[in-house]
Amino acid sequence: MVSVGIIGASGYTGAELLRLAARHPEFEVAYATGDSQAGTAAASLYPSLAGAFPDLVFEAFDAERAAGLDLVFLGLPHEASLEMAVALRGRVGTIVDLSAAFRLKDPSLYPRWYGFTHQHPELLDDAVYGLPELGREALRGASLIATPGCYVTAASLALAPLVRRGAIDPAGVIVDAASGVSGAGRAAKPNTHFCTVDEDFTAYGLLDHRHTPEIEQVTGAQVLFTPHLVPMNRGILATCYARPASGTVPTTDSLLELLGGFYADEPFVVVRRDAPSTKATLGSNCAHLTARYDERTGYVMVLCAIDNLAKGASGGAVQAANVALGLDEAAGLANVGMFP
């Protein structure tokens, strides 16, 4: 069995990690922290976990308690996660960080996009990006994994195959994406209160959302990214627009064939002609994609739907950990969504 620690287990991504660990045949949760909830039973905060973790109590972080664990997930704010990873390196087997602390390879981007100076830029080269569909081999045996942002997962799975195969012009790509409110985290905020989000649909982070440079880093495209908040709990739908590469004349069929071929052996990517829906991915680790070419306007359109807490965060983290540890990549993860 793989001994697992979840640092920051009291947040939504932490609770999702616990849910997935409960069904994982190789994971045994040995340690779960939640400093603001230290002393609180996990089942008290999240009754959905009562069947699997009736006696688990969130603890305050103690490096000695974490030492020797095979696998540690970090579900903390970026700067806290950065310092935690440094403290745990060499004391635990594999670290999977769900924050952005190690996602960007260029340390100069952190002050502009995240508002802090990266104090350990030497670790950015060591960290392996945790999106198996686009970099599986690098993950094998990795000891420090940076999992993608939720929007980045959806946009990158949609765009990267087309950029890599030379099907679209990488300049001037537009990504419009909408997310459920759980992406904002468990802490109460004025802009995520029920009365604020109910019956509302709003854009935010105009021209400066922090996932922009990450999408560009992963896809190799220049991106104008606009996120939106939708009054639902979970899910992301990304709609991406690009011009065809110079000298190419795509069709809807050729785009679907390209995506289908690129992801033919992927257990968690579904390519269909039908438009994807977030509800179809709910609770699963799947990404649902489709594509179109509009002859009238000359645009390529690619859509991707995921569950932001599953494939977009905790599910993707478990998938990356499975690859790093040499386990069955699909262990603990569902490829069928919940409906209705």
What are these regions (language model features)?
Residues Y241-P340:
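C-terminal active-site/capping subdomain that shapes the small-molecule cofactor and substrate pocket
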Residues T192-S284:
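Contiguous C-terminal substrate-recognition/catalytic subdomains in enzyme active sites
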Residues E16, L20, L157, P161, ...:
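Alpha-helical scaffold segments in soluble metabolic enzymes
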Residues G11, H78, D125, V152-S156, ...:
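Electropositive phosphate-/nucleotide-binding environments in soluble metabolic enzymes
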Residues V29, P170-V175, L224, F268-R272, ...:
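A short coil-to-beta-strand element that immediately follows conserved catalytic motifs
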Residues S3-I6, A146, T239-Y241, V302-A305:
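Short glycine-rich or small-residue beta-strand-to-loop segments that form or flank ligand, phosphate
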